[in-house]
Amino acid sequence: MVYILPVFMIIVAYFSGRLPEVLFKVNKRNHVSVSRGETCINGMFLLFVLWDIFAVIASYCGIGFTVIVRIYVAVLGIILIASNIILYRNKKPKQWYSDINIPRIFILAVVVLLLQFALIFYIAPDISEDNIKVSVLTIISDGRLHVTDPETGISEGYSVSLLGRIPELDSFYAMLAYLTDFKTEALMYRAVPVIVLLFSYMAYGLWADLLCDKTDDGKRKKSILYVVIGALNICGSISMSGIYYYQMHCGFRPEVIIFSVFVPYTAYLCYRIFRDKDHVCVAYLILTYITSFCVAGVIRGFIPLIAVSVISTMIVIWGDLAHKHGWIRNVKTGEGR
Protein backbone atom coordinates (compact mmCIF):
# COMPACT_ATOMS: atom_id res chain seq x y z
CA MET A 1 0.00 0.00 0.00
CA VAL A 2 2.77 2.44 0.89
CA TYR A 3 4.47 2.08 -2.48
CA ILE A 4 1.33 2.90 -4.48
CA LEU A 5 0.71 5.93 -2.28
CA PRO A 6 2.28 8.41 -4.77
CA VAL A 7 -0.17 7.36 -7.49
CA PHE A 8 -3.08 7.45 -5.06
CA MET A 9 -2.13 10.91 -3.77
CA ILE A 10 -1.89 12.35 -7.29
CA ILE A 11 -5.32 10.94 -8.20
CA VAL A 12 -6.92 12.31 -5.04
CA ALA A 13 -5.15 15.66 -5.46
CA TYR A 14 -6.33 15.96 -9.06
CA PHE A 15 -9.99 15.35 -8.27
CA SER A 16 -9.79 17.59 -5.18
CA GLY A 17 -8.33 20.40 -7.25
CA ARG A 18 -10.69 19.83 -10.15
CA LEU A 19 -13.83 20.12 -8.02
CA PRO A 20 -13.53 23.86 -7.17
CA GLU A 21 -12.45 24.61 -10.75
CA VAL A 22 -15.70 23.15 -12.07
CA LEU A 23 -17.88 24.64 -9.33
CA PHE A 24 -16.49 28.15 -9.83
CA LYS A 25 -16.08 27.72 -13.61
CA VAL A 26 -12.45 28.80 -13.51
CA ASN A 27 -11.62 27.87 -17.10
CA LYS A 28 -14.70 29.64 -18.48
CA ARG A 29 -14.13 32.89 -16.60
CA ASN A 30 -10.42 33.00 -17.29
CA HIS A 31 -8.77 33.26 -20.69
CA VAL A 32 -5.89 31.01 -19.59
CA SER A 33 -6.92 27.43 -18.89
CA VAL A 34 -5.66 25.60 -15.80
CA SER A 35 -3.28 22.75 -16.60
CA ARG A 36 -3.54 19.34 -14.98
CA GLY A 37 -0.27 19.88 -13.13
CA GLU A 38 -1.60 23.08 -11.60
CA THR A 39 -4.84 21.29 -10.71
CA CYS A 40 -2.90 18.55 -8.89
CA ILE A 41 -0.76 21.05 -6.98
CA ASN A 42 -3.77 23.11 -5.88
CA GLY A 43 -5.62 19.93 -4.96
CA MET A 44 -2.72 18.75 -2.81
CA PHE A 45 -2.64 22.11 -1.06
CA LEU A 46 -6.37 21.88 -0.40
CA LEU A 47 -5.94 18.40 1.07
CA PHE A 48 -3.20 19.62 3.38
CA VAL A 49 -5.13 22.69 4.53
CA LEU A 50 -8.17 20.49 5.12
CA TRP A 51 -6.07 18.21 7.30
CA ASP A 52 -4.72 21.26 9.12
CA ILE A 53 -8.26 22.34 9.96
CA PHE A 54 -9.11 18.87 11.22
CA ALA A 55 -5.88 18.76 13.27
CA VAL A 56 -6.65 22.05 14.99
CA ILE A 57 -10.20 20.93 15.75
CA ALA A 58 -8.91 17.62 17.12
CA SER A 59 -6.40 19.41 19.32
CA TYR A 60 -8.73 21.89 20.93
CA CYS A 61 -11.68 19.50 21.21
CA GLY A 62 -9.67 16.59 22.55
CA ILE A 63 -10.60 14.25 19.69
CA GLY A 64 -8.42 11.18 19.33
CA PHE A 65 -6.00 10.81 16.43
CA THR A 66 -7.60 7.70 14.95
CA VAL A 67 -11.05 9.28 15.09
CA ILE A 68 -9.95 12.41 13.24
CA VAL A 69 -8.17 10.27 10.62
CA ARG A 70 -11.35 8.30 9.94
CA ILE A 71 -13.39 11.49 9.67
CA TYR A 72 -10.82 12.99 7.31
CA VAL A 73 -10.83 9.90 5.09
CA ALA A 74 -14.63 9.96 5.02
CA VAL A 75 -14.57 13.60 3.92
CA LEU A 76 -12.05 12.74 1.21
CA GLY A 77 -14.37 10.00 0.01
CA ILE A 78 -17.23 12.48 -0.20
CA ILE A 79 -15.02 14.90 -2.15
CA LEU A 80 -14.00 12.19 -4.61
CA ILE A 81 -17.59 11.06 -5.16
CA ALA A 82 -18.85 14.64 -5.60
CA SER A 83 -15.98 15.48 -7.92
CA ASN A 84 -16.60 12.45 -10.13
CA ILE A 85 -20.33 13.15 -10.31
CA ILE A 86 -19.83 16.80 -11.24
CA LEU A 87 -17.08 16.01 -13.74
CA TYR A 88 -19.26 13.33 -15.33
CA ARG A 89 -22.14 15.77 -15.73
CA ASN A 90 -19.79 18.34 -17.26
CA LYS A 91 -17.92 15.80 -19.34
CA LYS A 92 -16.49 17.01 -22.63
CA PRO A 93 -15.07 15.01 -25.53
CA LYS A 94 -11.47 15.72 -24.57
CA GLN A 95 -8.56 13.32 -24.62
CA TRP A 96 -5.74 13.26 -22.07
CA TYR A 97 -3.25 13.12 -24.93
CA SER A 98 -4.50 14.67 -28.14
CA ASP A 99 -1.20 14.22 -29.99
CA ILE A 100 0.65 10.91 -30.05
CA ASN A 101 3.72 12.40 -31.72
CA ILE A 102 6.23 11.98 -28.89
CA PRO A 103 9.77 13.35 -29.32
CA ARG A 104 12.59 10.90 -28.74
CA ILE A 105 14.07 13.13 -26.06
CA PHE A 106 10.83 12.66 -24.10
CA ILE A 107 11.62 8.95 -23.77
CA LEU A 108 14.99 9.91 -22.30
CA ALA A 109 13.21 12.25 -19.86
CA VAL A 110 10.99 9.37 -18.69
CA VAL A 111 14.04 7.13 -18.24
CA VAL A 112 15.78 9.82 -16.20
CA LEU A 113 12.66 10.22 -14.04
CA LEU A 114 12.48 6.47 -13.41
CA LEU A 115 16.18 6.49 -12.54
CA GLN A 116 15.49 9.14 -9.90
CA PHE A 117 12.76 6.95 -8.42
CA ALA A 118 15.20 4.05 -8.27
CA LEU A 119 17.84 6.20 -6.56
CA ILE A 120 15.34 7.36 -3.94
CA PHE A 121 14.69 3.71 -3.06
CA TYR A 122 18.39 2.85 -3.14
CA ILE A 123 20.23 5.68 -1.41
CA ALA A 124 20.26 6.12 2.34
CA PRO A 125 18.12 9.04 3.58
CA ASP A 126 19.80 11.83 5.50
CA ILE A 127 18.08 11.75 8.89
CA SER A 128 20.65 13.84 10.77
CA GLU A 129 19.25 16.66 12.90
CA ASP A 130 15.71 15.60 12.15
CA ASN A 131 12.96 14.79 14.65
CA ILE A 132 10.03 14.28 12.30
CA LYS A 133 10.07 10.50 12.65
CA VAL A 134 10.02 10.81 16.44
CA SER A 135 6.98 13.07 16.24
CA VAL A 136 5.20 10.72 13.85
CA LEU A 137 5.81 7.68 16.05
CA THR A 138 4.74 9.64 19.13
CA ILE A 139 1.47 10.65 17.50
CA ILE A 140 0.74 7.08 16.42
CA SER A 141 1.67 5.44 19.73
CA ASP A 142 0.01 8.01 21.99
CA GLY A 143 -3.11 8.44 19.90
CA ARG A 144 -3.12 12.23 19.93
CA LEU A 145 -1.28 15.02 18.16
CA HIS A 146 2.22 15.84 19.38
CA VAL A 147 5.13 17.86 18.11
CA THR A 148 8.80 17.32 18.85
CA ASP A 149 10.79 20.47 19.53
CA PRO A 150 13.57 20.56 16.87
CA GLU A 151 15.97 22.22 19.35
CA THR A 152 15.45 20.16 22.50
CA GLY A 153 14.05 16.97 21.01
CA ILE A 154 11.34 17.00 23.70
CA SER A 155 7.93 15.70 22.66
CA GLU A 156 5.22 18.16 23.64
CA GLY A 157 1.49 18.39 23.19
CA TYR A 158 0.03 19.92 20.08
CA SER A 159 0.65 23.66 19.87
CA VAL A 160 0.66 26.37 17.23
CA SER A 161 3.62 28.75 17.15
CA LEU A 162 3.53 31.85 14.95
CA LEU A 163 7.32 32.16 15.15
CA GLY A 164 8.31 28.55 14.72
CA ARG A 165 7.23 25.43 12.94
CA ILE A 166 3.64 24.34 12.99
CA PRO A 167 3.39 20.56 13.45
CA GLU A 168 0.82 19.66 10.81
CA LEU A 169 3.44 18.08 8.55
CA ASP A 170 4.30 15.58 11.29
CA SER A 171 0.65 14.78 11.90
CA PHE A 172 0.02 14.56 8.15
CA TYR A 173 2.77 11.95 7.88
CA ALA A 174 1.27 10.15 10.88
CA MET A 175 -2.11 10.09 9.13
CA LEU A 176 -0.52 8.62 5.99
CA ALA A 177 1.38 6.07 8.10
CA TYR A 178 -1.88 5.07 9.76
CA LEU A 179 -3.45 4.49 6.34
CA THR A 180 -0.45 2.48 5.08
CA ASP A 181 -0.34 -0.04 7.93
CA PHE A 182 2.23 1.96 9.92
CA LYS A 183 5.06 1.62 7.40
CA THR A 184 6.59 4.79 8.78
CA GLU A 185 10.13 4.51 7.44
CA ALA A 186 9.05 3.38 3.97
CA LEU A 187 6.52 6.21 3.92
CA MET A 188 8.81 9.04 5.02
CA TYR A 189 12.05 8.01 3.35
CA ARG A 190 10.73 6.43 0.12
CA ALA A 191 7.13 7.29 -0.75
CA VAL A 192 7.08 10.94 0.37
CA PRO A 193 10.28 11.91 -1.54
CA VAL A 194 8.76 10.35 -4.67
CA ILE A 195 5.59 12.39 -4.17
CA VAL A 196 7.60 15.58 -3.64
CA LEU A 197 9.67 14.84 -6.76
CA LEU A 198 6.53 14.35 -8.86
CA PHE A 199 4.98 17.60 -7.68
CA SER A 200 8.30 19.35 -8.26
CA TYR A 201 8.18 18.20 -11.88
CA MET A 202 4.62 19.50 -12.12
CA ALA A 203 5.70 22.91 -10.83
CA TYR A 204 8.59 23.18 -13.28
CA GLY A 205 6.34 21.81 -16.00
CA LEU A 206 4.15 24.90 -15.62
CA TRP A 207 7.17 27.03 -16.46
CA ALA A 208 7.91 24.77 -19.41
CA ASP A 209 4.39 25.40 -20.71
CA LEU A 210 4.99 29.15 -20.47
CA LEU A 211 8.37 29.14 -22.18
CA CYS A 212 7.66 26.53 -24.86
CA ASP A 213 4.85 26.37 -27.40
CA LYS A 214 2.83 23.29 -28.35
CA THR A 215 4.77 22.51 -31.51
CA ASP A 216 7.12 19.56 -31.87
CA ASP A 217 10.06 21.86 -31.20
CA GLY A 218 8.37 23.13 -28.05
CA LYS A 219 7.78 19.59 -26.81
CA ARG A 220 11.42 18.79 -27.47
CA LYS A 221 12.51 21.81 -25.41
CA LYS A 222 10.23 20.73 -22.55
CA SER A 223 11.73 17.26 -22.59
CA ILE A 224 15.24 18.73 -22.52
CA LEU A 225 14.26 20.79 -19.46
CA TYR A 226 13.01 17.65 -17.69
CA VAL A 227 16.22 15.80 -18.57
CA VAL A 228 18.34 18.66 -17.19
CA ILE A 229 16.36 18.75 -13.93
CA GLY A 230 16.69 15.00 -13.56
CA ALA A 231 20.42 15.09 -14.31
CA LEU A 232 20.92 17.74 -11.63
CA ASN A 233 19.04 15.62 -9.09
CA ILE A 234 21.01 12.50 -9.99
CA CYS A 235 24.36 14.28 -9.84
CA GLY A 236 23.34 15.98 -6.60
CA SER A 237 22.45 12.65 -5.02
CA ILE A 238 26.10 11.57 -5.05
CA SER A 239 27.36 14.81 -3.50
CA MET A 240 27.49 15.49 0.22
CA SER A 241 25.57 18.77 0.23
CA GLY A 242 23.68 21.15 -1.98
CA ILE A 243 20.14 21.76 -3.10
CA TYR A 244 19.81 18.64 -5.24
CA TYR A 245 21.39 16.46 -2.57
CA TYR A 246 18.60 17.40 -0.19
CA GLN A 247 16.03 16.84 -2.93
CA MET A 248 17.06 13.19 -3.22
CA HIS A 249 18.15 12.40 0.36
CA CYS A 250 15.76 14.56 2.42
CA GLY A 251 12.61 14.86 0.35
CA PHE A 252 10.48 14.46 3.46
CA ARG A 253 11.76 17.62 5.18
CA PRO A 254 9.59 20.75 5.13
CA GLU A 255 12.29 23.08 3.80
CA VAL A 256 12.92 20.72 0.87
CA ILE A 257 9.21 20.66 0.04
CA ILE A 258 9.14 24.46 0.14
CA PHE A 259 12.08 24.79 -2.23
CA SER A 260 11.12 21.98 -4.61
CA VAL A 261 7.41 22.73 -5.05
CA PHE A 262 6.36 25.98 -3.42
CA VAL A 263 9.13 28.26 -4.72
CA PRO A 264 8.75 27.52 -8.47
CA TYR A 265 4.96 27.45 -8.17
CA THR A 266 4.87 30.79 -6.33
CA ALA A 267 7.05 32.39 -8.99
CA TYR A 268 4.77 30.93 -11.67
CA LEU A 269 1.65 32.36 -10.01
CA CYS A 270 3.24 35.80 -9.74
CA TYR A 271 4.01 35.66 -13.45
CA ARG A 272 0.42 34.73 -14.25
CA ILE A 273 -0.97 37.46 -12.01
CA PHE A 274 1.14 40.37 -13.24
CA ARG A 275 1.86 39.28 -16.82
CA ASP A 276 -1.33 37.49 -17.88
CA LYS A 277 -3.60 39.47 -15.51
CA ASP A 278 -4.98 36.17 -14.25
CA HIS A 279 -6.86 37.16 -11.10
CA VAL A 280 -7.85 33.57 -10.32
CA CYS A 281 -4.18 32.93 -9.52
CA VAL A 282 -4.50 35.39 -6.62
CA ALA A 283 -6.67 32.83 -4.84
CA TYR A 284 -4.15 30.11 -5.69
CA LEU A 285 -1.32 32.27 -4.34
CA ILE A 286 -3.17 32.84 -1.07
CA LEU A 287 -3.74 29.09 -0.81
CA THR A 288 -0.02 28.55 -1.41
CA TYR A 289 0.90 30.97 1.39
CA ILE A 290 -1.48 29.28 3.83
CA THR A 291 -0.18 25.82 2.96
CA SER A 292 3.45 26.91 3.29
CA PHE A 293 2.71 28.16 6.79
CA CYS A 294 1.18 24.80 7.67
CA VAL A 295 4.07 22.81 6.16
CA ALA A 296 7.11 24.73 7.40
CA GLY A 297 5.91 27.61 9.58
CA VAL A 298 6.62 31.30 9.22
CA ILE A 299 10.41 31.38 9.14
CA ARG A 300 11.07 28.43 6.84
CA GLY A 301 7.87 28.56 4.81
CA PHE A 302 5.85 31.75 4.69
CA ILE A 303 8.64 34.36 4.71
CA PRO A 304 10.71 32.71 1.93
CA LEU A 305 7.64 32.63 -0.31
CA ILE A 306 6.98 36.30 0.34
CA ALA A 307 10.56 37.03 -0.73
CA VAL A 308 10.11 34.89 -3.86
CA SER A 309 6.88 36.73 -4.66
CA VAL A 310 8.53 40.14 -4.38
CA ILE A 311 11.51 39.15 -6.52
CA SER A 312 9.33 37.42 -9.12
CA THR A 313 7.00 40.41 -9.36
CA MET A 314 9.92 42.79 -9.86
CA ILE A 315 11.34 40.55 -12.61
CA VAL A 316 7.96 40.34 -14.37
CA ILE A 317 7.47 44.10 -14.23
CA TRP A 318 10.99 44.70 -15.53
CA GLY A 319 10.41 42.13 -18.27
CA ASP A 320 7.20 43.88 -19.36
CA LEU A 321 9.05 47.18 -19.59
CA ALA A 322 11.87 45.51 -21.52
CA HIS A 323 9.45 43.94 -24.00
CA LYS A 324 7.55 47.19 -24.36
CA HIS A 325 10.68 49.12 -25.27
CA GLY A 326 12.16 46.26 -27.31
CA TRP A 327 15.19 45.77 -25.08
CA ILE A 328 14.92 41.96 -25.07
CA ARG A 329 13.46 39.36 -27.40
CA ASN A 330 10.20 37.55 -26.66
CA VAL A 331 10.86 33.84 -26.17
CA LYS A 332 7.80 32.63 -28.10
CA THR A 333 7.17 35.33 -30.72
CA GLY A 334 10.76 36.44 -31.31
CA GLU A 335 9.77 40.10 -31.12
CA GLY A 336 12.27 42.64 -29.81
CA ARG A 337 15.99 42.96 -30.22
Feature annotation, model-predicted:
Residues 281-300:
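Membrane-interface alpha helices of multi-pass inner-membrane proteins
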Residues 115-236, 242-251, 261:
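Active-site lumenal/periplasmic loops and adjacent helix-entry segments of GT-C-fold
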Residues 101-118:
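Internal/C-terminal transmembrane anchor helices
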Residues 4, 60-70, 239-258:
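Membrane-helix boundary/interfacial segments in multi-pass membrane proteins
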Residues 299-315, 322:
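Transmembrane-embedded, aromatic-rich helix segments that form part
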Residues 12-20, 253-275:
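Specific aromatic-rich, kink-prone transmembrane helix
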Residues 1-98, 305, 319-323, 327-337:
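Membrane-embedded, hydrophobic transmembrane alpha-helices
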Residues 20, 24, 57, 204-216, ...:
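Transmembrane-helix signature of membrane-embedded glycosylation machinery that interfaces
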